[in-house]
């Protein structure tokens, strides 16, 4: 019997001296043998909450990164200067949302000094960034909804940054004072979920952690209450932005109420302190996705839309592009105006359109078309006809003398014929004498 007890003590002694050997011998399914036990929750298939939250947070990181690129790339296409002034604050909000998704991994892994310090400090700071940006946006929306003119972009961003710096100072002082006080007391102070050392950030009680977030809750409450007056402004086109903020803050209030109750009361009542870390991780992932779905995506979809004032000016003074289609449209409009002569003035056409001396030229040689001269026409006259009738004798006519044209007109020929008929012949015979019409008697 004594030999049996001694054998049991010899076999059990290495387990007490080397507790890591027992942990390495019980690797959860899905994890490799050489993995640090700190990261077992990331691959443990028996407790799937870590893998699910890891996938949700990874999808959120990718989505937030893509939305940030889209928002920054759309800056040259933003026509409304009032919306452009909010882009800096919205990019700052996206960075805070990206940090919330990354902080989920710190809550999934098992607690140690670094992970607990990041949880206690970054949890309040990252939420303060998001809620400060929402509060600054509400501050600008109240001006825009009433006056259609808000503060400048750097003013809005400065307001969000100053509100965030307040939480940074609060968290820094709280974390330092808590650690220094715990190390000075030296007592076995700790959390109900684990017996950590006094100076460790993981030794902070759940109630103390929630009390340190009072300023963040005030930011959330201010953004929620400030969104209501923006819905009653005179300029209705800013109401939808107020609805986005109101829906986001209302969802955040519901999430915060649930996780605070579970973190401070529910887990303790059900004797399950190991669910403290999953509670924080679920709250981070749920609230970050609420920011993306209810605020970021609607704002990105509205950022490139023009204001009603710019649309009205575009209708009054349309932009004229330089291109082939524009030239064709202008020529078509001019031709339609010229061809429509229903209400045009009665003016001579020659005065409007000067005739070119080459308008009758069709590209053919002149020798191909027979054009008789005046002498050729004179020689073709039959010889038995009276030359006086064909070529009448020129007389002293006032109209002919006053005319500067050398070409005979019809009335000149008629007057010459009548004069020849009235003059009797000199020799009494019907003689035919050729008289040159260009020589005066």
From Swiss-Prot:
Compartments, record wording: Cell membrane; Cytoplasmic vesicle membrane
PTM sites of type Phosphotyrosine: 414
Induction of expression: By all-trans retinoic acid (ATRA).
Transmembrane intervals: 51-71, 86-106, 121-141, 156-176, 209-229, 242-262, 280-300
UniProt main location, coarse: membrane
Keywords linked to the UniProt accession: Cell membrane, Cytoplasmic vesicle, G-protein coupled receptor, Glycoprotein, Membrane, Phosphoprotein, Receptor, Signal, Transducer, Transmembrane, Transmembrane helix
Family indicated by similarity: Belongs to the G-protein coupled receptor 3 family.
Protein name, per record: G-protein coupled receptor family C group 5 member C
